[in-house]
């Protein structure tokens, strides 16, 4: 018989930098999970993606064991890395902060495909372009 899931915790943690301090400690402590065990496993699994924020979905079972699934980094984080900026524009409709080439948008869309509900890469590109527009990033060919 399969173990029964009692709680699902969703967090966004910098890759390779999970530690028992907030937000990880309190979220997992309430569920009764071995926090250091999770931190070590997460850091080992995401060591190659340093500098990116990784969404993670942790399933906690009745016996306090857990499994977790790492997702692809948010499109906004990938766009900031591609554009070389710290943050998006406060006024995206008036003030543009960077430009990104369309082939870079395609690369980001292909990276995000497993987590998006898009039927094709072109549809995923439109989603990423929308995120870029809302951040004040101009897309050029």
From Swiss-Prot:
One of its GO terms (cellular component) is cytosolic large ribosomal subunit. GO terms for molecular function: large ribosomal subunit rRNA binding; structural constituent of ribosome. Keywords: Methylation, Ribonucleoprotein, Ribosomal protein, RNA-binding, rRNA-binding. One or more lysine residues are methylated. Part of the ribosomal stalk of the 50S ribosomal subunit. Interacts with L10 and the large rRNA to form the base of the stalk. L10 forms an elongated spine to which L12 dimers bind in a sequential fashion forming a multimeric L10(L12)X complex. HAMAP family: Ribosomal_uL11. Forms part of the ribosomal stalk which helps the ribosome interact with GTP-bound translation factors. This is Large ribosomal subunit protein uL11.
